[in-house]
Amino acid sequence: MNPPIARQLNLDETKLPAEIFERLSRRGATLKDYRRRREEAIENFGKPGRDPAELGSVMTTIAGNGVWAANMKLAQLRNHWDQVVGQAIASHSAVADFTDGVLTIRAESTVWATQLTYLIPQLTDTIRRNLKGLTITEIRVTGPAAGYTRKWARRR
């Protein structure tokens, strides 16, 4: 006849019930905690400090912290471009890109690109004054992108 399994596996027979029922006792403890938290939530309902926050204030807090701040300032610059450079220039230019502190402005024509090039010091001061969270190290002005030109093959 075979010896009991506890001896075969070198287990302590006095500890077996505790090992078996440990999982059930942990589950019972979590159920007790769940009931206690539920009762506390019911008791604390409506007390000061538990009022819901307005969505706008929560989103402002989230947008103002972390990596969103620079993107929000850039979006603000794009949306209010006419207030930065004036209506006449804004109708012929736009913010094209912002990467690693370099702001790229795309102009409608080379004439407007030249005009914006002369305004770079004033633009830098205005942007730094109005958008304090946006760090601009350089402003580049580009003219219109060269369109696709097809090279016609000459026939001999």
UniProtKB/Swiss-Prot annotation:
* PANTHER family found in the cross-reference section: UPF0232 PROTEIN SCO3875
Please give the family membership noted in the entry: Belongs to the UPF0232 family.
Matches recorded under InterPro entries: DciA-like, UPF0232_actinobac
Q: Which HAMAP family match?
A: UPF0232 (MF_00630)
Entry protein name: UPF0232 protein BL0636
